[in-house]
């Protein structure tokens, strides 16, 4: 395994990204971080946990900073420009790495963005951790979906996620006692992702 930082060109300019590369790849996983106006970056612990989960599954695992975060160009755009950034980065990776299967994962605001991305591309796997339903108009996700939420989430109430998931028929994996940031539960979170997506 190697890891490295790189840059891609997006609609607002530079996109700063980080990759975990397993060598032999079964696909590309793109991970989106929580809300940029509340300190969210690609180095968020849950974003890193998701990246390491997909690395273990054999994916080239890429997390990136939304516009206006770190050295990424631009300014916060309420999920609209952030979706375009994600799509531009996926296009860049497809050209560089070839037409590998795609997986999407996102936490909180990043889950909202990845739900939008999932409606624009063919993704083999989608994992949303505490997606920001109730805060944003999160679109339906047609793909098979792994939804993970903390029972004691103080930012996105579990009941809001049930309201969003119920009409779509999506199952929800609930971690009893876990908060929005899954304090002390990251190893468990990783195991759920890896076990869910193992062949």
Model-derived segments and their meaning:
Residues 1-24:
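N-terminal cap/lid segment of alpha/beta-hydrolase-fold proteins
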Residues 14, 23-65:
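Short, surface-exposed "cap/lid" segments of acyl-processing enzymes
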Residues 74, 178-190:
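Catalytic histidine-centered segment of alpha/beta-hydrolase-like enzymes
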Residues 76-96:
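Alpha/beta-hydrolase active-site loop
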Residues 105-114:
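Gly/Ala-rich beta-loop-alpha elbow adjacent to hydrolase catalytic centers
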Residues 141, 146-149, 153:
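Short beta-strand/loop motif that positions the catalytic acidic residue
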Residues 151-156, 180-181:
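Acidic catalytic loop of the alpha/beta-hydrolase fold
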Residues 157-165, 187:
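Short alpha-helix in the alpha/beta-hydrolase fold that links the catalytic acid
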């Amino acid at each position: 395994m190697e890891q490295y930082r790189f840059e891609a060109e997006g609609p607002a300019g530079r996109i700063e990204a980080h990759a975990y590369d397993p060598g032999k790849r079964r696909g590309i996983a793109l991970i989106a971080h929580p809300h940029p106006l509340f300190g969210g970056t690609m180095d968020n612990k849950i974003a890193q946990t998701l990246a390491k989960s997909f690395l273990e599954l054999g994916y080239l695992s890429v997390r990136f900073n939304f516009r206006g975060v770190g050295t990424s160009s631009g300014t916060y755009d309420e999920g609209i420009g952030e979706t375009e950034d994600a799509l531009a980065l996926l296009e860049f990776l497809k050209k560089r790495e070839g037409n590998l299967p795609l997986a999407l994962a996102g936490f909180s605001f990043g889950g909202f963005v990845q739900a939008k991305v999932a409606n624009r591309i063919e993704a083999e796997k989608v994992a949303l951790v505490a997606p920001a339903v109730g805060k944003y108009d999160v679109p339906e996700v047609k793909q098979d979906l792994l939804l993970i939420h903390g029972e004691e989430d103080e930012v996105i109430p579990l009941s809001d996620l049930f309201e969003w998931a119920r009409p779509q028929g999506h199952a929800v994996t609930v971690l009893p006692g876990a908060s929005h940031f899954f304090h002390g539960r990251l190893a468990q979170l990783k195991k759920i992702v890896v076990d869910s997506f193992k062949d």
